[in-house]
Amino acid sequence: MHFYEELVMQTQRVYSQYAGIYAAGGTPYVRTDKPPLPYPEQIARLVREIREADCVVVGGASGLSAAGGGDFYYADNASYRKYFGKYAEKYHFKGAFDGMMHHWDTREEFWGYLATFLHTTQTAPLRAPYIDLQALLQGKDFFILTTNQDTQFVKLYPEEKVAEIQGDHRFFQCAACCTDDTWDAVQPVAEMVRAMGPRMAVPTGMIPRCPHCGGEAFPWVRGYGNFLEGKKYEAQYEKISRYVLSHKEKKVLFFELGVGRLTPMFIQEPVWHLTLAFPHARYIAVNRQYNFLPKELEEKGMVIVEDIAKVLRDARAQAGKGGNTA
């Protein structure tokens, strides 16, 4: 087991122990009572911390994509209607994940929905917050850790710079995990969507199959399937573990973006531990809803409670003016 994976396992045990607190949207960690800086000063500090850091570890979660329009997972909103309109009208789903939990009458209908879902993320253009983040990281030594499966980061950066610890919509695996192999999902998904047209079911012969056992395939993602924790999965943890351990004596900035209350054990809480443990580490989080900064980190960290797209846009503009050392 790799170093960062061990951290995740430790924080998962905390999550299990205090499940009720997390379910209520809280945290068992003692939070700082230190008042936040005014917003302009927070932006100036963010720009300064990025500039002065030797390296930046970005922890990108669902709130980052949601801030750029990828907010169709949990709500029947304009984005959901744009991409899943026919399903919203017929089934009245309250977001994309609602459809994943639906008991479909046929596998052809299930795959019609799943192909629509995967095609939406696979073909989505780069969202504005990612572009602004890229500008902020220009010229920096950085690494990306993400729980997002929507392929936004790998559209920007080479795979050696990104650890996708919750999977990736570009790949299929055997649904029964009969093999450790993963394979391309992009072309089969495009072909299913093209063959389906306005209908809501794929042809039977197009249902993706495992090339080894002949059973159904499934996207290589955690959340609603039998997630394959094999060589590709371990490679993600190896990348982030190697990066943080090789930079532990550096002035590393852990930059958390959009972590919610369902999965704090994958990015947020391990990063808290690393910030506390590494002598020169700093921590900044941006979250539109939650102001969770442990008291132990109040001198090493900051949380900006604001729309992530706005924060990254404002920080990029500030950095473009030469920043602010205030």
Feature map (PLM): residue ranges:
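Conserved catalytic alpha/beta core of Sir2/sirtuin-type deacylases, generalized to analogous enzyme cores
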Residues: 2-326
